[in-house]
Structure formats: C-alpha cells, structure tokens
C-alpha cells in the first residue's frame, strides 16, 4: 500500500486509466469480431449487401483502432498489426485467389 499522498493519487489515476483502456480495447475487439463475422457471412453467401457490410465493419474497426493508438491505449505497431490482420482477412474474402 502506498504511504504518501502522491503515490496514493497515482494508484487512483492508474486505476481510472486502466478502466478507460479496458473499455477502448473491448469495443475495438468487438468491432474486429464483427468484421471477421461479416467476412465469414460474405464468403458463405456473396452479394452486394454482404460486401457493403464487410466494408463498413472494416471502416468502423479501423477507426476505433486508430483512435486507440491516438489516445495511447495501443502501441502504434500493435495497432498496425491489428489493421493488417483485418485487411488481410477482408482481402482474402473480397479478392479470392484466381
């Protein structure tokens, strides 16, 4: 347990930041899962509506990842890695190997 006032305050601040970061990461993961699910749905039944769903979910996930990096929740390399995973999955579905 902290002994002085500044250490106690730092503990409070760290807990507040941890909770804020947790919500950011949770919503980011949710949007990524939605994008992967949209990719699966498109590969099962291709169509214009499913393709639009894939693209909008990818845009939303990219936006959330960029904001998480900007705020400092994620390291920029981690954010780039997540975006790379998403775009690879989307590319695999939308542009099948010919």
UniProtKB/Swiss-Prot annotation:
Disulfide bond positions: none
Keyword set includes Ribonucleoprotein: yes
Superkingdom of source: Bacteria
Name listed for the protein in its UniProt record: Small ribosomal subunit protein bS20
Any Pfam family matching the protein: Ribosomal_S20p
Record has Ribosomal protein as a keyword: yes
Keywords from the named record: Ribonucleoprotein, Ribosomal protein, RNA-binding, rRNA-binding
Function text: Binds directly to 16S ribosomal RNA.
GO cellular component terms, A-Z: cytosol; small ribosomal subunit
Protein species of origin: Synechococcus sp. (strain CC9605)
Similarity-based family: Belongs to the bacterial ribosomal protein bS20 family.
UniProt xrefs under PANTHER family: 30S RIBOSOMAL PROTEIN S20, SMALL RIBOSOMAL SUBUNIT PROTEIN BS20C
GO annotation (BP), single: translation
Family annotation (Gene3D superfamilies): Ribosomal protein S20
Coiled-coil stretches noted in the UniProt entry, renumbered to this chain: none
MF-aspect GO terms: small ribosomal subunit rRNA binding; structural constituent of ribosome
SUPFAM superfamilies xrefs: Ribosomal protein S20
């Amino acid at each position: 347990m902290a002994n002085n006032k500044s250490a106690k305050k730092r503990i409070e601040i760290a807990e507040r930041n941890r909770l804020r970061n947790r919500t950011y990461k949770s919503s980011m993961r949710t949007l990524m899962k939605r994008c992967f699910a949209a990719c699966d749905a498109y590969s099962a039944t291709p169509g214009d509506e499913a393709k639009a769903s894939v693209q909008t979910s990818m845009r939303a996930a990219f936006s959330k990842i960029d904001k998480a990096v900007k705020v400092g929740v994620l390291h920029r390399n981690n954010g780039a890695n997540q975006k790379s995973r998403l775009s690879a999955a989307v590319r695999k579905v939308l542009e099948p190997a010919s």
